[in-house]
């Protein structure tokens, strides 16, 4: 069973609200909008110390009752973390080791193997779900290359392999959906996203091709990636299509 906290992802895809500002206020709003999960983006929130991060996660979980994905995205993968890589990894590792810490952690496939393994080992030891992610903001890799990326994520220890790409054509989008479907039919949990205008519809379509997570914004003016709908919009469209 694939789950994050007590949320069973085998039943249906979860809508993840990306928290990138005013953490407690926006988290409450996301919960009211119907979010299933919260992604706490430490890099976008500007949180760099363990105490503040731990308190933020504790309050958000207590106030909303929703499971939390912890992300501290590197600049090379589209994030805003500007500190040392060792500090980024240490912060992730320490937070996922806390009893009342996050329920899942996102670590990039591109992170150095030693650093990536450190985060994954800590997560597994504390029963936390591991998301191994890969982001390409300039293109969509070829079909077989995308399959290989997901395979490498699972070999690295992913419970969920996440792949976000920038399509240049409708064919790119179709290939991504094919990759998601193949992975799901093979029994693997994936999250696949085509960003930007061409891929915007995948945020509500990909769940029907095997994607177990779809990310959404809480405020329309502020989003973490191009093409994100708002949480309530995604929930409504998914309900109409189910």
From Swiss-Prot:
Pathway(s) served: Metabolic intermediate biosynthesis; chorismate biosynthesis; chorismate from D-erythrose 4-phosphate and phosphoenolpyruvate: step 3/7
- Name the species this protein comes from: Methanosarcina barkeri (strain Fusaro / DSM 804)
Native organism taxonomy: Archaea, Methanobacteriati, Methanobacteriota, Stenosarchaea group, Methanomicrobia
The record's note on quaternary structure and interaction partners says:
Homodimer.
Q: Name one GO molecular function term.
A: 3-dehydroquinate dehydratase activity
Active site per UniProt: 135 (proton donor/acceptor), 162 (schiff-base intermediate with substrate)
The alphabetical list of record keywords is: Amino-acid biosynthesis, Aromatic amino acid biosynthesis, Lyase, Schiff base
Q: Does the keyword Acetylation apply?
A: no
EC assignment = 4.2.1.10
InterPro entries given in the database record: Aldolase_TIM (IPR013785), DHquinase_I (IPR001381), Type-I_3-dehydroquinase (IPR050146)
Q: Which family does it belong to?
A: Belongs to the type-I 3-dehydroquinase family.
Q: Which NCBIfam families match?
A: aroD (TIGR01093)
Residues binding 3-dehydroquinate, per UniProt: 39-41, 73, 203, 228
The molecule here is called 3-dehydroquinate dehydratase
Quote the PANTHER family the UniProt record gives. 3-DEHYDROQUINATE DEHYDRATASE
HAMAP family assigned to the protein according to its UniProt record, in alphabetical order: AroD
| Reaction catalysed by this enzyme | 3-dehydroquinate = 3-dehydroshikimate + H2O
Q: Name one Pfam family in it.
A: DHquinase_I
Q: Which GO terms describe its biological process?
A: 3,4-dihydroxybenzoate biosynthetic process; amino acid biosynthetic process; aromatic amino acid family biosynthetic process; chorismate biosynthetic process
Describe the function of this protein: Involved in the third step of the chorismate pathway, which leads to the biosynthesis of aromatic amino acids. Catalyzes the cis-dehydration of 3-dehydroquinate (DHQ) and introduces the first double bond of the aromatic ring to yield 3-dehydroshikimate.
């Amino acid at each position: 069973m694939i789950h994050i906290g007590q949320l069973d992802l085998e039943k249906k895809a979860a809508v993840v609200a990306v928290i990138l500002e005013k953490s407690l206020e926006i988290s409450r709003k996301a919960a009211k909008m119907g979010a299933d999960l919260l992604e706490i983006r430490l890099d976008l929130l500007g949180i760099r110390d363990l105490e503040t991060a731990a308190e933020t996660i504790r309050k958000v979980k207590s106030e909303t009752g929703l499971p939390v994905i912890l992300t501290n995205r590197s600049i090379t993968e589209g994030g805003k973390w500007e500190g040392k890589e060792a500090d980024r990894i240490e912060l992730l590792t320490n937070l996922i080791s806390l009893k009342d810490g996050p329920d899942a952690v996102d670590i990039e496939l591109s992170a150095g193997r030693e650093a990536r393994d450190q985060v994954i080992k800590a997560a597994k030891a504390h029963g936390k779900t591991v998301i191994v992610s890969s982001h390409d903001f300039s293109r969509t890799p070829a079909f077989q290359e995308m399959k290989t990326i997901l395979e490498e994520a699972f070999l690295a220890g992913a419970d969920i392999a996440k792949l976000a790409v920038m399509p240049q054509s409708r064919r790119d989008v179709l290939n991504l959906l094919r990759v998601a479907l193949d992975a799901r039919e093979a029994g693997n949990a994936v999250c696949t996203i085509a960003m930007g205008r061409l891929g915007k519809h995948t945020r509500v379509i990909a769940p029907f091709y095997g994607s177990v997570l779809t990310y959404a914004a809480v405020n329309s003016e502020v989003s973490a990636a191009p093409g994100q709908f708002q949480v309530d919009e995604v929930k409504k469209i998914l309900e109409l299509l189910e």
